[in-house]
C-alpha cells in the first residue's frame, strides 16, 4: 500500500545515518542496504491486511474520547507484532465543556504510543487519528458502519490502519534502525483536541525526544501514489463561535427604524 510506504520512507529517512539513493537503515555499508523497491515490496505485502483492517475499523466507528473498541483493535495488532506500546493517553478533562458545545464525548484514555527501534536518537514521530464522526452512513457496502449515527466519514479508519501497516514493516526491520520511531494513535481529533491533550500529558517529552513529527491525511484529489506538502499550515480546522447581535428588529421593508447597537 503506497501510503504505508510513505510512512515507512519518512521514518527510515529520518533515522538513517545519511541520505543516499534508495533508503538506508543501517550504518553497515555491506549489509541491510535496502532500496526503494525493497520497501515497496514489504509495504505491498501488507496491502490486503491493511485494507481488511481498515474495513473492520470502518464497521465500528466511535466518537471522540470514546474509541475503546478501536484502541483495543490497535493494541491487539501491536501485541501480535511484538511492538512495545503504552495506553491510557488523552484523558478527557473537558467533558462538560465539550458537552456545552454540543459534543458527546467519552472519558478518554484511548490514545496509544508505540515505539520501534534502538531506543536512541534520532527519534521521529508518526501520528494517526482514530475517531469517527456523528454522521449516519447511507452508503451500502459490506463494511458499512454498524453504529447508527456514527461513521468514519473523514478517513481516520484508513489512517489508523495504515500506521499499523507501517508498524508491521518497520518492526520487521527493527534491527536495522539506528534511531527510534515513535508511533501515535491519537483520539478525539474531531473537535476534542486529543493531540493537544497528549502533548499536555508529555508525549513530546518522552526520551528520546522526537526531532521531527509527521502526520498525513488521505486526499482523494491527488493521484494514487503521490504525496503533497508545504511549509507551514496545510489544512484548515473547524472552530465554534457565537455572534450576539443586539438592537431593534423589524420588518425587512422598514429597515430605517431598525438599528444595531
Give residue spans per PLM region.
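Cleavable N-terminal signal peptides of Sec/SRP-targeted secreted and luminal proteins
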Residues: 2-15
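Hydrophobic alpha-helical segments, especially transmembrane helices
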Residues: 3-4, 55, 157-160, 218
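Residue-level detector of alpha-helical segments with a strong bias toward transmembrane helices
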Residues: 12, 165-166, 257
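Hydrophobic alpha-helical membrane context
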Residues: 14-15, 141, 168, 229
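Acidic/His- and Gly-rich active-site-bordering loop/insert found
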Residues: 20-152, 161-178
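Histidine/acidic-residue-rich, glycine-tolerant segments that coordinate divalent metal ions
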Residues: 102, 110-112, 133-134, 140-151, ...
Amino acid at each position: 500500500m503506497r501510503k504505508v510506504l510513505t510512512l515507512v520512507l519518512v521514518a527510515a529517512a529520518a533515522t538513517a545515518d545519511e541520505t543516499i539513493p534508495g533508503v538506508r537503515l543501517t550504518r553497515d555499508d555491506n549489509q541491510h542496504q535496502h532500496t526503494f523497491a525493497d520497501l515497496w515490496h514489504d509495504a505491498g505485502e501488507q496491502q490486503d491486511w491493511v485494507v481488511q483492517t481498515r474495513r473492520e475499523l470502518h464497521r465500528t466507528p466511535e466518537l471522540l474520547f470514546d474509541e475503546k473498541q478501536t484502541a483495543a483493535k490497535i493494541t491487539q495488532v501491536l501485541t501480535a507484532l511484538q511492538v512495545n506500546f503504552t495506553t491510557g493517553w488523552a484523558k478527557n478533562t473537558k467533558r462538560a465543556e465539550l458537552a456545552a458545545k454540543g459534543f458527546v464525548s467519552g472519558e478518554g484514555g484511548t490514545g496509544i504510543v508505540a515505539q520501534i527501534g534502538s531506543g536512541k536518537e534520532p527519534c521521529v514521530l508518526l501520528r494517526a487519528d482514530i475517531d469517527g464522526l456523528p454522521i449516519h452512513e447511507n452508503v451500502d457496502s459490506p463494511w458499512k458502519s454498524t453504529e447508527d449515527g456514527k461513521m468514519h466519514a473523514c478517513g481516520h479508519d484508513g489512517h489508523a490502519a495504515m500506521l499499523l501497516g507501517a508498524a508491521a514493516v518497520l518492526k520487521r526491520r527493527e534491527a536495522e534502525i539506528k534511531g527510534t520511531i515513535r508511533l501515535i494513535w491519537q483520539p478525539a481529533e474531531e473537535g476534542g483536541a486529543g493531540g493537544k491533550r497528549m502533548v499536555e500529558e508529555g508525549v513530546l517529552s518522552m526520551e528520546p525526544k522526537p526531532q521531527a513529527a509527521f502526520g498525513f491525511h488521505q486526499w482523494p484529489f491527488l493521484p494514487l501514489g503521490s504525496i503533497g506538502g508545504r511549509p507551514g499550515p496545510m489544512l484548515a480546522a473547524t472552530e465554534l463561535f457565537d455572534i450576539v447581535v443586539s438592537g431593534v428588529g423589524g420588518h425587512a421593508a422598514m429597515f430605517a427604524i431598525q438599528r444595531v447597537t
